[in-house]
A protein has these predicted regions:
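Beta-lactamase-like hydrolase cores
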Residues: 1-41
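Active-site-adjacent helix/loop patches that line small-molecule binding or acyl-intermediate pockets
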Residues: 1, 69-176
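Bacterial peptidoglycan biogenesis and beta-lactam-recognition machinery
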Residues: 60-66, 97-101, 147-152, 158-178, ...
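Active-site SXXK
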Residues: 46-63
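Short glycine-rich loop/turn motifs
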Residues: 19-24, 138, 165, 256-259
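Short Gly/Pro-enriched turn/cap motifs at secondary-structure boundaries
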Residues: 13-16, 130, 248-252
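Structured C-terminal helix/loop/strand segments within mature extracytoplasmic catalytic/sensor domains
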Residues: 203-329
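A short glycine/serine-rich beta->alpha loop
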Residues: 37-45, 75-79, 122-131, 181-187, ...
Length: 329
């Protein structure tokens, strides 16, 4: 078993102060590894990076036939909880005759600083629609209604979650050894880094009209690329890097240092895990891989922000930087 390799370095002055190590793969349209760092067989929980897979049964089944690209993007989102996100998810719920109480994700303050500060200023209490996963849960409820299934759609034995597990194992081409309960209360199934890279490559290679699954995959990544602002929000790596890429690339972060990318024009899928769970490490690593693949200009402001981020102190003095390690440079 290969060990994790240094992927991102934190420099203070002339010294490397900290290192984020991890595992990563780039897979081709057949799922074969084109390039790897660390251990491709490392077992991981993909967390929110698996949302495109969790949305797959909804689209593939026909339940999403009348959904807009915005709704599909939100079904894959870890959104900021800004008004542009919550208004659209609330409208989606209203279309189904449902309300905030029908969610099972739980409430939390918006992830986006502006939306969070506004709620604090006005004394507003967060609802479940402010949960960054509320779009995914609206998707689960869409599939629940299509199936005629019960209200407790987060239960691992619920038909919705069984469909998600089946899709997950089919696209990763692995039997999941188990799951953990994610922050939004649904099962998050384990696989290898290679498995997630293989799954993303399948999305990248999918052809619209080939079959229901491939058509669903194309609809999902196209929605993400068309609406990067809905997948995360201003200032977030997913959104800013999708906007910056020179060709369509779908990006999705996951908690605890996970990130995936779908590159449809190249038939490539990327998956990476920073083992200490640091988002700054995962953001830098994915930006570095995108530069390496030639789809992100290293001089683009978004690339510099996440790949070569300047560290400043409270007096705005530059004290160091975040940058890719030699393995990714």
């Amino acid at each position: 078993m290969a060990h994790p390799v240094p992927m991102v370095e934190i420099w203070r002055g002339p010294l490397a102060e900290s290192v984020h190590s991890g595992h990563a793969v780039i897979c081709d349209e057949r799922g074969a590894i084109r390039e790897a760092w660390g251990d491709p067989d490392a077992l991981i929980l993909p967390r929110s990076s698996s949302k495109m897979i969790q949305a797959l049964p909804m689209v593939e089944s026909g339940a999403a036939a009348d959904l807009s690209a915005e709704q599909l993007a939100l079904s894959c989102a870890s959104h900021n909880g800004a008004p542009e996100h919550t208004a659209r998810v609330s409208a989606w719920m209203t279309e189904m005759g449902l309300g905030d109480d029908d969610f099972r994700c739980g409430p939390h303050m918006p992830m986006g600083e502006a939306a969070r500060n506004e709620m604090i200023r006005t004394g507003e209490t967060p609802c479940q629609v402010h949960n960054n996963c509320s779009g995914k849960h609206a998707g689960f409820l869409t599939l629940t209604r299509h199936m005629g299934a019960g209200a407790e759609y987060i239960d691992p034995d619920h038909p919705v979650q069984r469909a998600c597990l089946q899709a997950f194992e089919e696209v990763t081409e692995e039997t999941s050894p188990g799951f953990g309960i994610d922050g939004c209360s649904v099962p998050n199934h384990a696989c290898t880094v290679h498995g997630m890279g293989r799954a993303m490559a399948r999305y990248a290679a999918a052809q619209e009209g080939a079959d229901a699954r491939q058509t669903a995959m194309v609809r999902l990544w196209q929605a993400m690329v068309a609406h990067p602002d809905l997948v995360a929000g201003d200032g977030r790596a997913c959104t800013e890097l999708m906007r910056a890429c020179s060709e369509p690339v779908a990006l999705k972060t996951g908690a605890e240092g996970f990130f995936v990318a779908i590159l449809p024009r190249r038939g490539l899928g990327v998956a990476l895990k920073v083992i200490d769970g640091a988002a700054r490490g995962a953001d830098c690593a994915i930006a570095s891989i995108l530069v390496r693949l030639g789809v992100l200009d290293a001089d683009h402001p978004a690339a510099r922000r996440f790949r070569n981020a300047t560290i400043r102190n409270w007096r705005d003095i530059e004290t160091g930087m975040v940058k890719p390690a030699a393995t990714l440079a």
